Regions:
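Conserved N-terminal phosphate-binding loop of PLP-dependent enzymes in the Aspartate aminotransferase
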Residues: 1-459
Length: 459
């Protein structure tokens, strides 16, 4: 089947090139100005085929430089969960642009954004960054100060942004609780010392978690409520229970990174699976693509932030900010907060989330019916509006299981095949997501094109 997938990829890539000549020519010219012809490397790397040049989007669709229309199920890797040009967010952006984008001062929108975030995720106090990477950076710094410790625990298959300390992978041996096995960097350019205070455990392994916490040096346990960068791996109830009971008992903080799950279900995985975090982080789609990251925390941790504001390192006072190393000049800007208020209040509502969940169930059932029709031993799973092609019969429990269920040649062939049929599919390590702008007809269109691909794959 892999050989057949590669054959489909070759054929469909040629067809894709014939449909996108203007994008291709633009990329040739752009290589004189930008590495690989793109302003950010992921725009090539994540697609695993030449990208198109986008010119506009509306609702659940976007158009490229050649005039091709695509039904979007990638949602820009969760940053466009609201859909393109969402009317409430567009109106908020236009209004704020006329008032001023940033003041390096609070604006009135901040209080309402905090209230709306508390409604969804439960935590009472909030700070803002420009990305989820920034949010996780600030959360870890807060955890180190609050606990007086340095070690951070993360899990195989995770992704928490471009933060040096957590761009490492390994598999933890739970048999003796001693760790080991070494770490491998997830990317080039990291400080080799940045992984010195991190351990990578096996997701859903409560015994490994318990053993590592027993060493008494952990500042924070950072996890996604469901793994989303190696397919979709859901947490087992006993794992959730262990995290809730044992992290805090060991003197550490539990940080739940909702960036990829925050709008799949209302309240994200935190509410859906029953996590009880000390800190919640998020970002990406909150403001409809306007840069933002969020850090939610308990009142006690807010007190830690406030209590350290007066810290200074003993040098001549310069008027700079010292305290905990959080913040940034453009963090919590008026534009980001206005867009976030509109998104949280008018787009990502409980009623809308229920509708997206219903569409996600429609997508899951339709894809499973197509898989069963052609006789493949695959399963389709989902979390709310996010579905997952699982190219194995059994549900994955760990990151390693998740990666085993993502067969890249098949994913690559499916992505370019669907693009040629007017559907922009999710990137290989993710699954199709229903945006808040999508309709039942959009979901049915995805299912129909997916069925055509499966017919080709099994021919």
């Amino acid at each position: 089947m892999v050989a057949r997938a590669r054959e489909i990829k070759r054929r469909e890539s040629a067809a894709f090139a014939s449909r996108t000549p203007r994008s291709a020519e633009w990329l040739v010219q752009a290589r004189t100005r930008m590495p690989d012809g793109v302003p950010m490397a992921w725009m090539v790397a994540l697609q695993r085929h030449p990208p198109v040049v986008a010119v506009r989007g509306a609702g659940s669709r976007f158009w490229d430089l050649d005039g091709n229309e695509y039904l979007d199920f990638n949602v820009a890797d969760q940053s466009m969960a609201a859909g393109f040009a969402s009317a409430p967010i567009v109106a908020a952006i236009a209004r704020q642009a006329g008032l001023g984008n940033h003041f390096l001062l609070p604006t009135a929108e901040a209080m309402e954004v905090c209230r709306l975030l508390t409604e969804q995720f439960g935590l009472p106090q909030w700070q803002f960054t420009l990305s989820a990477s920034g949010a996780n950076t600030d959360a870890l710094r807060l955890a180190r100060v609050a606990t007086g410790r340095s070690a951070v625990l993360i899990f195989d298959g995770k992704y928490h942004g471009h933060v040096d300390q957590i761009l490492w992978s390994s598999h933890y041996d739970s048999s003796d609780g001693a760790g080991g096995g070494g770490l491998a960097a997830d990317a080039l350019g990291l400080d080799p010392e940045s992984g010195r205070h991190v351990d990578v455990l096996t997701y859903n392994d409560a015994a490994a978690l318990r053993a590592r916490l027993a060493r008494g040096d952990v500042a924070a346990v950072l996890l996604e409520p469901a793994l989303t960068n190696c397919g979709l791996v859901l947490p087992m109830p006993e794992f959730v229970a262990a995290l809730n009971a044992e992290v805090r008992a060991a003197g550490a903080l539990l940080i739940v990174d909702e960036t990829h799950t925050q709008f799949a279900v209302y309240g994200g995985g935190t509410r859906h699976f029953g996590f009880e975090p000390d800190i919640v982080t998020g970002g990406k789609g909150i403001g409809g693509g306007i840069p933002i990251g969020v850090v939610g925390m308990t009142d006690a941790l807010a007190g830690v932030m406030t209590g350290n504001l007066a810290y200074w390192p003993g040098r001549e006072e310069t008027g700079d900010c010292h305290g905990i190393a959080t913040g940034g000049t453009l963090y919590a800007n008026a534009m980001s907060l206005s867009a976030a208020r509109a998104g949280l209040a008018e787009v990502f509502t409980p009623v809308a989330a229920d509708r997206v969940g219903d569409l996600g169930e429609r997508l899951q059932r339709g894809l499973q019916a197509q898989v069963d029709r052609v006789g493949l031993p695959w399963t389709i799973d989902r979390l709310g509006g996010r579905a997952q092609w699982r190219l194995t019969p059994a549900p994955p429990r760990t990151g390693a299981d998740g990666f085993d269920s993502v067969v890249l040649p098949i994913c690559d062939a499916r992505k370019v095949f669907m693009a040629n049929h007017g559907v922009w599919d999710a990137i290989a390590a993710a699954g199709p997501s229903v945006s808040y702008a999508a309709s039942a007809a959009d979901v049915d269109a995805y299912i129909a094109v997916a069925g055509k691909f499966l017919d080709e794959l099994t021919a």
